[in-house]
């Protein structure tokens, strides 16, 4: 099953990369939400009685994307944290603590690109 998950993740990355290049205009919040859910699934830890998933996510955005989100960053962060809570609840996953989404600027990134780092449990 992990082969299929790996293939799906790679295919998803290629498709997202294609659309990012084909349709410039920066990062969209829905991309960030999908990436969080995918990383929760990929990085889950199966315990004896529970499945644990990461609860802290650090997005590094290009300067133009970060600037575009500046006015709505607080609301976007709350919405993405809610996605973490709801996804965990729907799938029966456990969080170690409250979800936390952080945005930082990375001047080496071009508009429409971002990186996501997880703070593992």
List where the protein language model places each region.
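Conserved small/polar residues in nucleotide/adenosyl-binding loops
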Residues: 119-121
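Alpha-helical bundle protein-protein interaction modules that mediate dimerization/oligomerization
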Residues: 83-117
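Short glycine-rich, basic-tinged beta-strand/loop micro-motifs
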Residues: 10-20, 48-71
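Short, non-transmembrane amphipathic alpha-helical segments
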Residues: 36, 72-92
């Amino acid at each position: 099953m992990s082969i299929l998950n790996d293939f799906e993740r790679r295919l998803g990355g290629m498709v997202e990369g294609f659309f990012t290049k084909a349709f410039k205009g920066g990062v969209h919040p829905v991309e960030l939400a999908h990436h969080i859910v995918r990383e929760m699934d990929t990085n889950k830890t199966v315990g004896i009685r529970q499945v644990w998933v990461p609860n802290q996510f650090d997005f590094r955005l290009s300067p133009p994307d970060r600037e575009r989100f500046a006015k709505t960053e607080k609301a976007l962060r709350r919405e993405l944290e809610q996605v973490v809570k709801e996804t965990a609840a729907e799938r029966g996953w456990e969080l170690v603590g409250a979800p936390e989404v952080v945005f930082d600027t990375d001047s080496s990134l071009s508009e429409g690109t971002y990186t996501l780092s997880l703070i593992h449990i």
